[in-house]
């Protein structure tokens, strides 16, 4: 099966005055439909930059990023915008701009114009149910726990029915049980809906339910060790630490 997302020898640099800061170095990575790929790395390893380049928000300095055979770095701004509205979902836990919105309204916002409020909110309730957050449909963002905010943010991305989901550190500030709940839900969403998921996390335990594990260190992906699905794995990470 052809990959949904393909990164080929991708590098990304920024200029800091006269100096060049290399954040990604020759990164090659595939994400196929129906799989969750988790990238582990310490702070500053380049995880967020990797996701932003993979999403087409930032162009690579060199290399190629393709989504379903579309070269994102060469696609027009309007073509990328259409993909972001429909096929490529981005999860961020920023919450609604208006604190007056309840969560079914917030999750429905991306569909209001195309589907109308009533149908949009029905789709929103389905998305909230998919992530196990239907109980907070009538709650406001300020009243949610960290776990509930994470689940609502994922639902807001899923309501568009994307084919690719990019998730930056969904386990931040969560306990172990909630980390496994969130990553397990993402794994199930990938398998049940044929969704490709690329997730960046700083903690090894959050990745145990991923289909593929990748370690990122100083902008480079290390030699992968993939576990059997549903089982943990022991992986050597930078610094000689072992996690299981």
Name each model-derived stretch.
Residues 55:
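Helix-to-loop junction immediately C-terminal to a conserved catalytic motif
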Residues 63-71:
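Conserved ABC transporter NBD signature motif
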Residues 140-144:
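Conserved ABC ATPase signature
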């Amino acid at each position: 099966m052809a990959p949904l997302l393909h990164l080929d020898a991708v590098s990304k640099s920024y200029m800091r005055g006269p100096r060049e800061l290399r954040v990604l170095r020759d990164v090659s990575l595939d994400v196929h439909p129906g799989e969750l790929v988790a990238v582990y790395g310490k702070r500053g390893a380049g995880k967020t930059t990797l996701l932003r380049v993979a999403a087409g928000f930032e162009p690579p300095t060199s290399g190629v990023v393709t989504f379903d055979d579309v070269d994102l770095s060469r696609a027009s701004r309007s073509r990328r915008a259409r993909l972001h509205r429909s096929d490529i979902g981005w999860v961020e836990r920023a919450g609604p701009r208006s604190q007056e919105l309840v969560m079914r309204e917030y999750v429905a916002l991306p569909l209001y114009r195309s589907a109308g409020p009533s149908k949009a909110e029905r789709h929103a309730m389905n998305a909230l149910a998919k992530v196990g957050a239907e109980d907070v449909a009538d709650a406001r963002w300020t009243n949610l726990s960290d776990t509930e905010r994470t689940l609502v943010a994922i639902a807001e991305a899923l309501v568009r029915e994307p084919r690719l989901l990019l998730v930056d550190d969904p386990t931040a500030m969560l306990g172990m049980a909630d980390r496994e709940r969130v990553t397990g839900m993402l794994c199930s969403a990938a398998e049940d809906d044929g969704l490709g998921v690329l997730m960046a996390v700083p903690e090894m335990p959050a990745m145990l339910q991923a289909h593929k594990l990748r370690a990122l260190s100083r902008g480079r992906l290390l030699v992968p060790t993939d576990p059997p699905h549903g089982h943990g794995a022991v992986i050597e990470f930078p610094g000689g630490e072992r996690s299981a």
